[in-house]
Amino acid sequence: MRTANPGTWVTLESMNSQQEFVLRAIEEQDIRYIRLWFTDILGYLKSVAVAPAELEGSFEEGIGFDGSAVEGFSRVSEADTIAQPDPSTFQVMPRLHKEDTITSARMFCDIVMPDGQPSWADPRQVLRRQIKALADEGFHAFIHPEIEFFLVESLATDGKPPVPTDNGGYFDQAVYDRAPRFRQEAITVLEDMGIPVEFSHHENAPGQQEIDLRYADPLTMADNVMSFRYIIKQIAMKNGVQATFMPKPFQDLPVNGMHTHISLFEGDTNAFHDPDDENQLSDTAKGFIAGILTHASAVSYTH
């Protein structure tokens, strides 16, 4: 038998095996809290924590919540919503603060309705549907983001601009070693969580950093980026500063971006490449570019 999650086919045997692994890991590592994560349509991370004794039931029935209280999820008349943990995303959380005296873990959730149908508004389910649509055309994709953010001394609430943590510039190393140490700590934590990193460096603006994640399939990368944002902000807090991914927190400094490299394959063949084309671009690549331009305004709405 197979589950009917859009965008992927997972055997029930495989799902049960993953659940058993999670339950065993929780017992062996004395994990006290499991955080179940999902996002609203604006990309804000949501979380509910469950005790280990409740997790097996959560796998079976999910966690019910009021979807009408989550941005964009449902109307009051459709408030009953269920967060279904995805055991394949299980990861032990790092202890980043001295107050962290217990071990916790996290899993991402798929949001479903009481009848078991995927929520139309859950960003993870929307992505699953698009991955399935791509697969139906014979394609699969890989995503590689370059994520930029500012480290600032504080985010003022009195209308004054934030103060960058350093005066460094592009690829600078000697910025009191504060930025390099921060990036080193962040990369260590990310890789301990199973999120591989390719590059990191100081960006153009004072206090601006960039960390590039290694490519992955779209769903894995979406989960990784949400984990990345959380970890970066927690490490910043630990170091007495704050991190912001706001596109333009400074009027007179460069913006934060997330340059995203997209690879598209048909089997083992690069679907974007045509050696006979003047620019070595296939018709698929040209159509892909046209689609991005057509939908650019909608894509930029949430950033």
What is the role of each PLM region?
Residues 2-301:
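Glycine-rich, acidic/polar active-site loops that bind/position phosphate-bearing ligands
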